[in-house]
Design a protein with these regions (language model features):
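N-terminal signal peptide c-region/cleavage motif recognized by signal peptidases
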Residues: 18-22
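Absolute protein N-terminus
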Residues: 1, 24-27
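Bacterial N-terminal signal peptides that target proteins for export
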Residues: 2-13
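Short hydrophobic/aromatic-rich motifs at helix boundaries and adjacent loops
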Residues: 15-16, 72
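Intrinsically disordered, low-complexity regulatory regions in eukaryotic proteins
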Residues: 26-94, 98-238
Length: 238
């Protein structure tokens, strides 16, 4: 019998649980979300909470259509230089120790990419288990830690537009977190209705606006995860 926790929220760090009998966590991973830096690198620390040596395997999944009902994960072949590479992809974790694992984006990206890297304990470094190890794995919970890794574009562009269908569009090449949308009359910031959003919009994605009848413009306040600052766009609506 194997039980699995369903996805709790989209593009967030996840902890998957396969729990035949006993519930215990034999490792932790920190941090649970990583942004690749300008050198194309990032890292996490895998920390043992076990009294025994563990063998850890990392698997990379590309996240397609993030934060939409069509979101899905596509497994990336280990060592594929066109995607995120984990170093090392497999390793031994001695009791009570920790291990730094590096993420490397091998090629510059034209548009933001997001990955989920899953860390799990396996019976051996070669995934070949003995009967004794098989039994041990069956009698303890197998926790899979899902780390979100964001790779920025080489030349980030933050851009929002209102399209002909009167929808807000991310016309840039990186995600933005929409904080609020102000619907304003008479081209003034003083006569506005404020909508709180606090949701990401990814490159190419659209977002429905509230009724814009009677309004002249919207003021969209956002957070930029790459520069780590806030900004705003004033966009005419007709």
């Amino acid at each position: 019998m194997v039980a699995k926790i369903n996805r709790l929220s989209r593009l967030t760090p996840l902890l998957f649980v396969f729990a035949p009998f006993l519930a215990q966590s034999n490792m932790t991973v920190y941090p649970m979300a990583v942004s690749i830096n300008s050198q194309g690198e990032g890292n996490v620390r895998v920390i043992s909470k076990s009294n025994e040596v563990q063998y850890i395997k990392a698997t990379v999944f590309r996240i397609d259509n993030p934060s939409t009902p069509q979101e899905n994960e596509v497994e990336i072949k280990s060592g594929d230089a066109n995607h995120l590479v984990v170093m090392p992809p497999k390793f031994a974790l001695p009791a009570g120790s920790s291990k730094t694992v590096r993420f490397v984006a091998m090629e510059p990206e034209q548009k933001e990419k997001n990955y989920r890297v899953k860390f799990e304990a396996v019976p051996s470094i070669d995934d070949v288990a003995t009967d004794k190890k098989d039994l041990s794995m069956q009698l303890t919970v197998n926790l899979i830690w899902g780390i979100v890794v964001s790779v920025p574009p080489q030349q980030p562009i933050a851009k929002l537009e209102v399209n002909a269908a009167q929808k807000l569009v991310n016309a840039g090449n990186q995600r933005l977190k929409i904080l609020t949308i102000a619907y304003c009359k008479n081209n003034s910031k003083e006569n506005c209705k404020i909508q709180t959003v606090n949701k990401n919009i990814f490159p190419g994605q659209e977002r429905n606006l509230e009724s814009i009848s009677g309004y002249d413009k919207i003021v969209v306040k956002y957070n930029n995860w790459i520069t780590k600052d806030n900004g705003e766009f004033e966009l005419a609506v007709h």
